[in-house]
Amino acid sequence: MTIKIHNTLSNKKEEFYPQRGNFVSMYVCGITPYDEVHLGHARVYVVFDIVKRHLLRRGYIVKHIQNFTDVDDKIVKRSQEKNMKPSELAQIYIEDYFVQAGRLNILKAEKYPCVTQMIPEIVNFIKELVNKGLAYEIGGDIYFSVEKFKDYGKLSKRNLKDLRAGARVGVCNGKNSAFDFALWKKTKENEPREVTWESPWGKGRPGWHIECSAMSSELLGDTIDIHGGGQDLIFPHHENEIAQSEAKTGKKFVKYWIHNGFVTINKEKMSKSLNNFFTLKAIFEKYNPRVVRYYLLTQHYSSPLDFSDAGIESARNTLQGMDGTYLRLISSVKESDVEITDKDLSDLQGNFLSALDDDFNSEKALSYLHELKGLISKGLLTAGRERLSQLKKLFEDFAGTSLGILLPEEQNADESLQNLLKERNDARKNKNWAESDRVRKLIIDERGYKIFDNKDGSSLLVKKV
């Protein structure tokens, strides 16, 4: 068993060897909480949830840090529009993140640092860069000198010469280079007091890029095993993180960089200007979060993902069928604390785990889950209890532990619905088809359940997703 990761830095698939045995440090760039969480965010955090789940499944200990950029120009602007304190606005959308992430069944990080909680650490980081001659001050603003870091552009495969040739902007504000970026921003007129902190260079607040470097080094050390986010962060954000971190420490900042592909909506880029920008809250009014999570797993994380009505409906129907198969299985056998001894199931388990070992290929892993579903359907007709117990264990391992899409137990139907189901089954036995159809319509249309009829005459109810 060796996990392989496509490393953005080398643009190659590399074998995964963390720095310290089975301990893995992982830093994922979090949201800027000025608006509701959207579909693009969902893909990032589901992708890294699969990474974390598989690392845990393979026996690693994972220290996962995910930040909140809770001070930012967008937060200040939006809070002023809403006549709120920036901290109040940020807290609203931080809470929204946790609600929507919970609905997507995303495992929690070990820590969620906020920028406003780590200003002293950020200031100290900047001071070291200034003291080493890697950053300079202009009127209370501090800039990182990109020219001082010879490897600038190695993540995004750019170089300063090409950047200069393609640049449309000249040097402004007295900067040494147009590509030097802000580490500390002097307080502007009319900015709220609560986004202003004292520093050796006067009152101000951190720039965006320095925040992640300072927080990650404080909580995970100078070198991180895994770092990543969406592809849009490769340049300039992650490029600048590398520059300031490696310039400060002289050490490799990140061993393995992981970036997920963009989300499009019906083949168009998701954006507010095109009116195809969907918050998770709005999507979840129409689609079950489990369906959305399943759909996000149907493509390899590095590929673009098109979110379409046809695609999500297909995912809904597929997941509904899986739920029905699983409910039939758990109605036939309760035990799952068994060893996988049947060779075909052991081989299938190996194939499933190997798919995730190979750069966390959820698309391929799902194909083995579907293969398992077929074996369960066949087993329900012919298999004994031991075989069914193994099938149940494997399904819960694949769909639950690894992929996070297993039907929750609380979705079982309540007593009133079971009574309606009994009425329908009695009507069917008596060949009272009109009454059977009436109750069926009541269960499906008014109570939101699907009915799965078994060959032995019994039926199961599954909450529609």
Curated annotation (Swiss-Prot):
InterPro entries registered for this protein in UniProt: Cys-tRNA-ligase (IPR015803), Cys-tRNA-synt_Ia_DALR (IPR015273), Cys-tRNA/MSH_ligase (IPR024909), Rossmann-like_a/b/a_fold (IPR014729), tRNA-synt_1_cat_dom (IPR032678), tRNAsynth_Ia_anticodon-bd (IPR009080)
GO cellular component terms attached to this protein's record: cytoplasm
Domain of life of the native organism: Bacteria
Compartment annotation: Cytoplasm
Record field: catalytic activity: tRNA(Cys) + L-cysteine + ATP = L-cysteinyl-tRNA(Cys) + AMP + diphosphate
Keyword field: Aminoacyl-tRNA synthetase, ATP-binding, Cytoplasm, Ligase, Metal-binding, Nucleotide-binding, Protein biosynthesis, Zinc
GO terms for MF: ATP binding; cysteine-tRNA ligase activity; zinc ion binding
Binding annotation for ATP: 272
Quaternary organization: Monomer.
Family, per entry: Belongs to the class-I aminoacyl-tRNA synthetase family.
Protein name (database record): Cysteine--tRNA ligase
Species: Endomicrobium trichonymphae
